[in-house]
Swiss-Prot record:
The keyword Plastid does not apply. This is Probable chemoreceptor glutamine deamidase CheD 1. It comes from Methanosarcina acetivorans (strain ATCC 35395 / DSM 2834 / JCM 12185 / C2A). The gene is cheD1. Belongs to the CheD family. GO terms for molecular function: protein-glutamine glutaminase activity. Probably deamidates glutamine residues to glutamate on methyl-accepting chemotaxis receptors (MCPs), playing an important role in chemotaxis.
Length: 159
């Protein structure tokens, strides 16, 4: 049975919520999970993005599949729902290199795109857990801004 206090976010999607709701996504491998949070208003969002750049893909729909467009979309949604741009902070998780000989480096490119987009928007990354070679599940708490990171063999941690 699903927990009504937890909103699930699928791959290539995002959600925003207010305290006390939590937002969860699973399966962050080369994908990147980005949380944006206004600590004062207790509103935040989580984005689970697949690919680094919407312009290079030549696709106009579903911006949340793409790191750059997805972050811009998520920030706009949070502001539209009462968040203050000046008070927004970001956390970044994922971007793993899941396969040793991958020439595309999607994880690295997703991380780079996220950092560039957040910098362009003037948002500070206050914590991150990126790269490496393992998957992650994350649960974002809109009450505290904490981000619980769960892994199969490495245990859990909060950033």
């Amino acid at each position: 049975m699903a927990d009504p206090g937890i909103v699930m976010v699928g791959i290539g999607d995002c959600a925003i919520a207010r305290c006390p709701v939590k937002i969860k996504t699973s399966g962050l491998g080369s994908c990147v999970g980005v949380t944006i949070y206004d600590r004062h208003e207790k509103i935040g969002g989580l984005l689970h993005t697949m690919l680094p750049n919407i312009k290079k893909a030549g696709i106009k729909d579903n911006p949340t599949k793409f790191t750059d467009a997805g972050i811009e979309y998520l920030v706009a949604e949070i502001i539209e729902n009462g968040g203050s741009r000046r008070k927004l902070e970001a956390k970044l998780v994922g971007g793993s290199s899941m396969f040793e000989n991958s020439h595309m480096n999607i994880g690295e490119r997703n991380i780079k795109s996220a950092k560039e987009t957040l910098k362009k928007l003037g948002l500070e990354i206050i914590a991150e857990d990126t790269g490496k070679n393992y998957g992650r599940t994350i649960i974002f708490d809109t009450l505290t801004g904490d981000l619980l990171i769960k892994t199969m063999l490495r245990g859990d941690k909060v950033i």
